[in-house]
Amino acid sequence: MMTVSGLTLVSRILGFLRDVLIARFVGTGPVADAFVAAFRFPNMFRRIFGEGAYNAAFVPLFGRKCEEQGSEAAVGFARNTFSALVWAVGILTLVAIPCMHWIMMVVVPGFLPKFEKDLGGIGHGKSFYECRVEVKGAREIYFQITGKSEAAVRHWSARTRVEDMHLLDPEGNKRKLLVSLKDEGFPIVASGQKEIASEGLILTQLSLSGDKHSGVGRDVDPRKRFVPREGEDVLEVIFGIDPTGLARIQLPQDHGMEHFVVQVMVGKVDEGTEIREAVLRIFRNHPENFDLTVALSRIMFCYLFFMALVAHLSGVLNTFRYFAVPAGAPILLNLVMLGSLGLVWFMRWEGDLEVGKSLAWGVALAGCLQFVVLWIACSRAGAAMVPHKPLWNPELKKLLFLMGPGVIAAGIQQVNLLVGGVIASFQQGAISTLYYADRVNQLPLGMIGIALGIVLLPEVTRRLRSGREAEAAHSILRGMELAMLLTLPAAAAMVAVHEPLIQGLFAGEKFSAEDVAKTGWALAGFALGLPGYVLIKVLQPAYFAREDTKRPMIMAGVAVAVNIGCSLLLFRLLLPGGYGHVGIAIATAVSAWVNVVLLWRGMDGFVKIPRSEWQRLLRMALASLLMGAVVYLAGLALESWLSGTVWQRMIALALIVGTGITVYGALVLSLGATSLSALRSSLMADRGREN
């Protein structure tokens, strides 16, 4: 397991660097949401197929072939399966790409343009329009003005006066709120700030022409000055033109507003210009975000084709005990995506859209490279996979029968994240926020849970095939103990210092303090289920080794139902405060623990936990809680460094992590939760499995 964990650690570190740079380039804006939503498909299939589920069906059958009929017959079975995969996934890819628009309507329904108002034609005699815009839970409001002629010119301004809204002053008293739009010109600034003004505030008129960028930041006269009346305050929001040419109102963080009134004026820029008919539409989300998601998904969907084949090749290599190459293949994905970001920097491409497209093409290229590397490794191992017309024989039928429920069962966390993404698409910025939080959560999950699952499945399968059930149960028990020893402190630390971790990793010009807070709380929600995620990886081999994929599938279905119910409930409860996405993270954790309970009860006593193991578990939990308190205090002490330069933040994070490891190590040894000899024997046993 050490080799697998080591290579996975390298991949996770590179993935961290990749995501830190993505956060620096695009933050949590519309392009970030579009890329993350589009990337979810190939990334989900990489985790489901490449990290256990396909192996759950293929490895036991392939392993039995090796044991009973020899490697030559087993390789023949693998080649036939490979050929079937090429045909099946190839057809799926060719069908899905042109149908991506309809697929994304299911995956991210919240990205569909949400018309708040459509004023239709304006400019025929009437020069003043007013409409009420609902903004509850929104981060931005978009205005789109289109004309029937390129010569159409609109001169308009916007202001809001909301009499039934209130803002708490420093003394806690409610005061009426006057909202003003502040022109920042082009390009638009990244985030708005609450500013309570004591004096009059300038309201700027903007001029827009047929050229989507024309006039911005120039035709600002005449200006109107207004003074808040008694009992009113002023809340500024940012108003400008985004890179796609849409007028945008960026609302302050935690604005608490439910609606405001927009006043639109149509007039002449100069005496020689006539007013033409125009159409004004107002959106609660970026009207082009859905189309961008579809375009990026089409580019990256070919990654699914390569990942299905990579999963098959990984299963062959893992059964032959070549763990290193499959475990190291994801490193290529991170390297290529880092190269894509480097290309954006080198070419000095400006705009989030170019970053999103460059990353999408990088993902597609990485899938091809991973396939080539694993195909060469299989060939050198004497198992070259050459596609041919597949034979529809009983072995292939059995594999397909086992693979379906196995994919669902082993991919339960990814199914949960997919469901969460559907719900999160209705909150602006939530999809990218959940992505960044999940990436941090994936570090211990990838190093511990996935590595344990990959190594345990072939080992448990071999021992059950040879009738050594007690040894198989002992392997699972040791895996559970090691999983809890490592994940309990990781979960405690991520809950205790959720915001400092995100601050140190992602904070930047396009990743605001609001983004840090929201991502941090999502990380805390995911961390509550971290031990559960890893236990699922440890317990499932007890079923898959017996070729039982039906019961785990049913259990996974129950967990998904729990996840959907909890996500809908908690999202609705927390959305008014802007934290609906945290409810999705908590629901994912709850569903993971439900799945663990069902898997444990379904084993019918196959693995028994002695009293001494329960005592060690309680000591691990106590050590984790005490360590969590220590790192929380460390985070407070290093708060200024976490807000400093990149190097200061990295040093602060290293100090926090180092303190946590040292304190926890000392506590588990002093409390008797484990011993150095026990750790050494576990690691040596895992190394023996790899060799």
Which residues does each PLM region occupy?
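Membrane-embedded alpha-helical bundles of multi-pass transporters/translocases
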Residues: 1-121, 279-691
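Noncatalytic modules at the cell exterior or secretory-pathway interfaces
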Residues: 134-145, 243-248, 252-263
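Intrinsically disordered, low-complexity acidic Ser/Thr-rich regulatory segments
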Residues: 212, 221-232, 243-246, 250-256, ...
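Disordered, acidic Ser/Thr/Pro-rich linker "stalks" and the adjacent N-terminal cap
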Residues: 118-125, 177-241, 252
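Extracellular carbohydrate recognition
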Residues: 150-162, 270-275
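Short beta-strand-plus-loop segments that form exposed binding edges in beta-rich domains
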Residues: 144-152, 263-269
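Internal, charge-rich low-complexity segments
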Residues: 105-137, 151-152, 157, 173, ...
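Short strand-edge motifs at loop-to-beta-strand transitions and within beta-strands
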Residues: 127-131, 233-235, 247
